[in-house]
Amino acid sequence: MEIMSVEVSEGFNEEGLPDFKYYAFDWDDNLMYMPTEIMVKSFGDQEIGMGTADFAEYRGKIGKEDFDYKGHTIVGFAENPFRNFGVDGNDQFVKDAMIAKTGPSWNDFIECINGGSIFAIITARGHNPETLREGVEAIVKDGKGGLSFESCVESLKKYKGIIDGDGEELFQEYLDLCRFHPVSFGAGSAANPEEEKIKALEQFIKHVNSLSEELAVTMELENDIKNNFVPMIGFSDDDKANVDNVKKYLDDKGEENVNVYYTKTDKTKM
């Protein structure tokens, strides 16, 4: 398998028409380096907070073998280890998102939002989906790291006949079309999210295909366009296990319209 450094393009083509590029983003350590911690247990039953990047490295060991971590011997998970990532942490999520450092896929997120492209957030977190939406809305309206509510609205106005209304209405309708998948919400597992992320991506692919078909018909009717409209999705994640499982799933299905990007170090296409 060839691996190359790439950037995801998006938005409108040279004719000013939608280019049918869509995005699916993991959240933690991909879009942002959130301060939220998983709680693990050390020898002596002391609770130790573990960041998401470290958890991606150590999660295969937790509860299976003891290991040293920041001067402690970790023997397993603490009680309710993902408490900060679930509904109990809903309010804190938005606050953390406002102050968190941006991650390796942030520039793509800027292009996606400012260009009015449809996206999905597919994360191992277990917050209410509405909480993820509120977080995105808050950082866009705050102008975090180059995001622009005004640019997003101007891009959405190019979709006349597809979405209409004033700026706030356009933006809310836009978010209605996007998807927010906290895969450990409800019965999902934050410790082993790979299969749930695949299910979420599969749902987003179906959603994108449906949107693209509707958009293609509209553009053909309004502009007498006879091109082949093929949607392309870029999925990015910093967790190698998630990336490998998604890549295998797509290869097994023969899905050629989804590009998978591993973002742990340099952003690479798998």
Short names for language-model regions:
Residues 1-10, 92, 230, 244-245, ...:
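C-terminal accessory extensions appended to soluble enzyme cores
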Residues 16-18, 112-117, 147, 215-230, ...:
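Short helix-terminating capping/connector loops at secondary-structure junctions
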Residues 21, 197, 201-240:
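Conserved Lys-Pro-Asp/Glu-containing loop-to-beta segment of HAD-superfamily phosphomonoesterases
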